[in-house]
Amino acid sequence: MSCKTKPFGFNHAVKFFIQISFFFFILSTNACMSSKVCSDNDKNCSIQEQIYSIISAPQGIYLYTTQTSYQGNLAAYGSTLDDSLHNICTTNRIFASMINTSCSNVLPVVSTSTSPMYNFGTLYSIPDNTSYPVRGSKGGIIANSWTNMFPSLLMTLEQAGVTSQTFWTFANTGGTYNSADNCIDGTIVGAAGAIGSPTDNSTNWLLSGAPGCTESHPIICLCY
């Protein structure tokens, strides 16, 4: 008595399904290989989230917080304070938890003597119109445009999912450079530095206090 074999087409389909399933399993394993590299909340760890974000992330300027908190000597990570802040934001961009994973232009939301944040539109040509609203990590609108962010916010940074911690700004209300509280241009810890509030949506959100530069705080970065 001979045994009947299943049609070749069926066997081929099964093999193909197993191969493609194994391929996607390897990809997902590599994407989230270790909790030391990617946290559970890191959207860059999820292939599904990456595809979803590219398709669905609305246009805008996205804010994210650094994963690390820093003392006020923020100039220690580059040749100048501006260069150092950019390096900090670029490094932390990799692990930023936000729905827009494809943005590539990164800047620190920190004022310096040469680059006050209110003037980023002129200095760095960031989009400053209602087609590029300022958004939180999940896409919620914080301000209708970059300029509109300084008088007040539509929602706090905590409500927008950006951060629940105070953060270095070295700024006055309105986004100007705080010439008094800036940790001596981010060079020492023996001074004071201006910080912002995650729970204030008034004009004071950029200046909620000026603690000693020995304290550690994250900084907020933008990406578009």
Where in the sequence are the language-model features?
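Bacterial N-terminal signal peptides
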Residues: 17-29
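N-terminal Sec signal peptide cleavage junction
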Residues: 29-35
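Secreted/extracellular ectodomain signature
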Residues: 35-49, 55-224
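N-terminal secretory signal peptides that target proteins for export/translocation
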Residues: 1-14
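Generic extreme N-terminus detector
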Residues: 5-6, 18, 36
